[in-house]
Structure formats: structure tokens, C-alpha cells
Amino acid sequence: MDFLVLFLLYLALVLLGFVMICIGSKTHYLQGLISRGAQVFSYIIPECLQRAMLSVLHYLFHTRNYTFVVLHLILQGMVYTEYTWEIFGLCQQLEFSLYYLFLPYLLLIVNLLFFTLSCVTNPGTITKANELLFLQVYEFDGVMFPKNVRCPTCDLRKPARSKHCSVCNRCVHRFDHHCVWVNNCIGAWNTRYFLSYLFTLTASAATMAVVSTVFLVRLVVMSDVYLQTYVDDLGHLQVVDTVFLVQYLFLTFPRIVFLVGFVVVLSFLLGGYLCFCLYLAATNQTTNEWYKGDRAWCQHCPHVARPPAAEPQAYRNIHSHGLWSNLREIFLPATACYERKEK
């Protein structure tokens, strides 16, 4: 099968999986399909192998560890090594602007800075000492965050918008999610660093994709390959088309073409996730609240606390106060002053 067909199939499967994960988290029908699929596989895969797989998955996703942090740095190192080893030198020979070529390195430095800050910054851990301060930050909506609820694990009163992270075993103020790639919770005090990290990572992948693609296109134009003809398997003379050009470039520069494919896919995935995170920031929602929002007033969820009403009410986000106020709350979190007082 042609490389281009395989790559497009791979791209379609990756994007389909990404979309299904996003939609499946909000769609009970897809969750049911995934659950039934898991049951089918449980009859096929030996029990000992199932236990081993579950143990590995539990370690990777339900305990704090540096596996994905190391994997992140290895992948980033491999991509930049290939860029430096081949693409940078070849682009210099084609007289690319040095500002253009050094941009991915500048983005890498900034990205590593925000990556480190996302990893090491306290996301807003709630303790006995700061419990009262956090209780005053956000208003309780009585739906998703009712008053006078205690965390059964930490034995602390739960401030509005907080959540207990089972991975880190702590309650986090304005909890968004636990990110395995930074081995840390994303909360009130490090969301700004996480968004900046995600933006620079997306920008570096997109910039590298553009530089590499422009290099390949310029190479094709300079060599006049696109003006040539070739004889196909049936002995017919054919004009060079896109499929042939991709095959030709893959045989000539396999590592560069593979890199282009990887960073293009990565740019789409990161770009989509970045847009989702920016939407949450603009509307003053967290990932946890977005996920729980549709179920807050669900009549089929009796475990959800809701006041008696004559007719069902729709969940309303009471924490959104306009675009600029919402963004200011993330990038200049009010809780930073509480942290200084505590010290």
C-alpha cells in the first residue's frame, strides 16, 4: 500500500480516536459501546494478561510517576534532533532566513520554561491552614457545588470549584484536571502556565511543520520533478502527481517526511485541544465542570444534589463575568495573595 494512503489512514484513525474520546466522555451511548467492546475483549484476552495490562494502566494513569514526563522530553528531543541534524542544514543551503529557522528553538526554550512551571507549581492544594480562605473565593451554586460538603478523604470542607484528585491524593482549588504529561494537577495557580505551555508547544509543532513543508516544496520546485513523467506498472506514461511526489520525497528523505507527518498530526491534535482550553478559559469553566455540566440537572442522576423545584432547571455558570474578567482570573489568580498571606 502506498505511503500516502497509509499516512492518511493513520491520520484519520488518530483524529477519529481523538474525537471519540472527546465526544464519548459526554455521550452515554458511546460510553456504552466502549464498555461492551471491553467486555468482548475480556473474553478473548487471557486473564493473566488482563491483570498485567490493568496493573500497567493503573501505574501510568492512576499514580504519580514521571513516565509521561520522560516520554515527552524524549519525543521533543528526537524531533529537534532530526530538525537540527538534517532540516536546518539543508534549509541553510537553500538560503532560508535564519530568523525563520531559529524560531522553533526560541519556542522550545519558552515551552520548556512553562513546562517546568506546570510541573513544579502548586496547583492550589487545600489544607487545614488555608481551608477558610478558599471557602471565600467562589460562590456556591447549590447544584454542582453545594454548601457544607466535606471531602471524605481529606476531611476538609470543599470550597466551590474544588475537587479531590485521586492521583495526587489532595483537594485542589479550582480543579481542572490531572495531567500525566506534567505529572501534576492543573488548578487555580498553574492553569496560566499550562495554557502557555500548551500554546508554545502547539506553536513549535506548527512552525516546524511549516518550515519542513516549505523546504520539501521548494526542493520539488527547484528540481522540476513535478514537470516530469514516469512509467506506471502497466507500462503507461503518466504525469507526475501528488501521490508520486510524496512517494519520491519519502524515498529520498524518509526521516524528514516522517517528521512532517508527525508534526502535522501533532499540530492538529494540540491545536484542537488548545482551542477547547481557550473556550473553557473564555467562559470561566474547568474541564471538570464542563464534563459534569450536562449531568448537573439530569433527572436520571438521583445522586446529584439539587433543590426542590416545580420544574427542572438548566445548569447556569455563575462564575463567568465576561471575557476579560475570566481571562484575568486565570492569568492573575486572586488566590495568589492568599498564598502569600499563608507564608
From Swiss-Prot:
An individual GO BP term: protein targeting to membrane
Cytoplasmic face of the membrane: 24-67, 117-196, 277-343
This protein's name: Palmitoyltransferase ZDHHC4
Enzyme Commission number, as recorded: 2.3.1.225
Domain notes: The C-terminal di-lysine motif confers endoplasmic reticulum localization.
InterPro entries: Palmitoyltrfase_DHHC, PFA4/ZDH16/20/ERF2-like
TM segment ranges: 3-23, 68-88, 96-116, 197-217, 256-276
UniProt keyword annotations, A-Z: Acyltransferase, Cell membrane, Endoplasmic reticulum, Golgi apparatus, Lipoprotein, Membrane, Palmitate, Transferase, Transmembrane, Transmembrane helix
Subcellular compartments: Endoplasmic reticulum membrane; Golgi apparatus membrane; Cell membrane
Family assignment from sequence similarity: Belongs to the DHHC palmitoyltransferase family.
Pfam families in the record: DHHC
Alphabetized GO MF terms: protein-cysteine S-palmitoyltransferase activity
Catalytic activity: L-cysteinyl-[protein] + hexadecanoyl-CoA = S-hexadecanoyl-L-cysteinyl-[protein] + CoA
DHHC domain boundaries: 149-199
Subunit description: Interacts with CPT1A.
Renumbered ranges of motif Di-lysine motif: 340-343
Disulfide links within the chain: none
Gene Ontology cellular component annotations, sorted alphabetically: endoplasmic reticulum; endoplasmic reticulum membrane; Golgi apparatus; Golgi membrane; plasma membrane
